[in-house]
Amino acid sequence: MTFIYNKIMKLGAAGLLAAGVLAGCASTESKMAVPYIVELKADNQVNPNASGKPSPVKVTVYELKSTNAFDTADYFALMKDPRAVLGDQMLEVNSRIIKPGSTEEIKASGSTQAKALGIVASYRDLNNSQWRLVVELPEAETTNFYKFWQFSPDEKRIRIDVQRAAVNVNKTEPK
């Protein structure tokens, strides 16, 4: 009887130890952000000046929780003080100056709260350009219960064409 009791106690202790180790490996987050790269490709004839010559253009990318404030924001207010205009809807902001015919990348780890990117191109002729674009981001991925089984989400590539007087999403795909 003592032999069986000792065996049960050892198995029980081993089971509790294993459960404790596995619980220690459990992820506390239920979602993981999807990392992404924004590829900004400028057209050869982008942002023409008064004489029609292509010129560099500044492109600003906002990582957003919601697009409500961005959709209605004035260009000049966004450029002057984006935090005042977008408030807590803005998570991150990155800018690049792109030369005609060139490509720039913005790499981001993403955020579980991010829902979209707001993209603004600072064209010379704002009144005759489509300077604002919203691109939906992939949803944060649900994590596994045990962290050691968890793989990082695949990085997504978001291609944005910065055309003569408009910004357009080309496509979103895994890298």
Task: Enumerate the predicted regions with their spans.
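C-terminal motif of bacterial Sec signal peptides marking the signal peptidase cleavage site
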Residues: 21-24
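Bacterial N-terminal signal peptides that target proteins for export
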Residues: 2-15
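Tryptophan-paired
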Residues: 73-111, 125
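Bacterial signal peptide processing site
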Residues: 26-29
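Glycine-rich, aromatic-bearing surface loops/beta-hairpins
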Residues: 132-175
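Short amphipathic, basic-aromatic surface patches that mediate peripheral association
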Residues: 38-50
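A short, solvent-exposed beta-strand micro-motif common in secreted/extracellular proteins
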Residues: 115-125
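Short coil-to-beta strand junction motifs in C2/discoidin
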Residues: 51-60
